[in-house]
Design a protein with these regions (language model features):
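A conserved regulatory-domain signal marking ACT and ACT-like small-molecule sensing domains
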Residues: 1, 7-14, 18, 24-29, ...
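Short beta-strand scaffold segments in enzyme catalytic cores
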Residues: 40-43
């Protein structure tokens, strides 16, 4: 919701979330015991009933880390504008993504590729120094090897 760590609205964040139509619930994880103490799993569902499960960790001091998307271990902080591409693990897909970014003068600060297994679903995480163009997700989605694109803008 874009709140800073010292934002006074944090104490009312649950009500604010409900007011803007964000449906949420808290379910304690009683199965996994070997996770960071400030871990949250977020199951997101869109209007088409597509699901994605994100695991994040609060590291303190307003810092957080995303460590899992679905069942794939990833690692990024969200300190930069971030592009998350869910794709097939095939030759040429990363080249396509970087060409789309280059064509729009996006400077890549960090880029990592994570995958379920060879030839299966992969996740490209691209962190940029600046804001990502509004239409970059639409451009990248044009590839038949890309199933979804998400953007975290700072």
């Amino acid at each position: 919701m874009g709140f800073g760590t010292d934002d006074m609205r944090i104490r009312d964040s649950f009500e604010i979330a409900k007011d803007i139509g964000l449906d949420f619930s808290f379910v304690p994880n009683e199965i996994e015991t070997d996770v960071h103490p400030n871990t949250v799993d977020i199951l997101m569902t869109n209007e088409n009933e597509d699901h994605i499960l994100i695991r994040g960790e609060s590291l303190g001091g307003g810092k957080a880390r995303i460590c899992r998307i679905n069942d794939v271990e990833v690692d990024f902080t969200g300190e930069y504008s971030t592009l998350i591409v869910i794709q097939k693990d095939k030759p040429g897909v990363v080249t396509y993504i970087t060409k789309c970014l280059s064509d729009q003068d996006v400077n890549i600060a960090f880029m990592r590729l994570f995958r379920e297994s060879k030839g299966n679903t992969a996740y490209s995480i691209v962190e940029s120094d600046g804001l990502l163009p509004e239409n970059i997700a639409e451009e990248i989605r044009k590839s038949p090897n890309v199933s979804d694109v998400m953007i975290i803008q700072l």
